[in-house]
């Protein structure tokens, strides 16, 4: 499927194909072909756009929630796991331009790449279609997901959930420790490995392309291992 046919499904008639090619071009592809562009600059813009429009959506659709809860929902919505799931649902992986190495390791299925591409493509739509086209795109992708009745339950804050569990048991010795930082040149990102330690013992491990994401995943792993409330 080409770019034009892909966007026809969303009633978007593209004007500048080049901006979409840029949004779908991974660093590995650009390096192999000595291109002067990849999706990274558009990813930067797309991240800011999603922060803004997700904030507006939450503000107007969840009028009873306070600032803290809105912030939690926004963070959960724009995190890698959520965006990559949407990218998979719309079959975005088939459009990504990857280098040979990334193709061999199925880079089109990697959460980090799928999330980045969704951000970059969102920026491309905004540049090419302005706000009207952007809203058409978001309504059929991200906002559709956010309108699901289970949305609030799905976007969990595992760190807060773990903290509440420990507080209920009057336990406070909780620490998140960065165990490893691995830099990936092709993606220009650092993969963090974080452990959750309770009373000096490791109870969970998580990875992510930000410290916050790694901590959330570590907390989730910890919660899954705590089959029953902690006791003194």
Curated annotation (Swiss-Prot):
Gene3D superfamilies: 3.30.160.20, Ribonuclease III domain. Its cofactor is Mg(2+). Keywords: Cytoplasm, Endonuclease, Hydrolase, Magnesium, Metal-binding, mRNA processing, Nuclease, RNA-binding, rRNA processing, rRNA-binding, tRNA processing. It catalyses: Endonucleolytic cleavage to 5'-phosphomonoester. Its EC number is 3.1.26.3. Homodimer. This is Ribonuclease 3. It comes from Mycoplasma capricolum subsp. capricolum (strain California kid / ATCC 27343 / NCTC 10154). The gene is rnc.
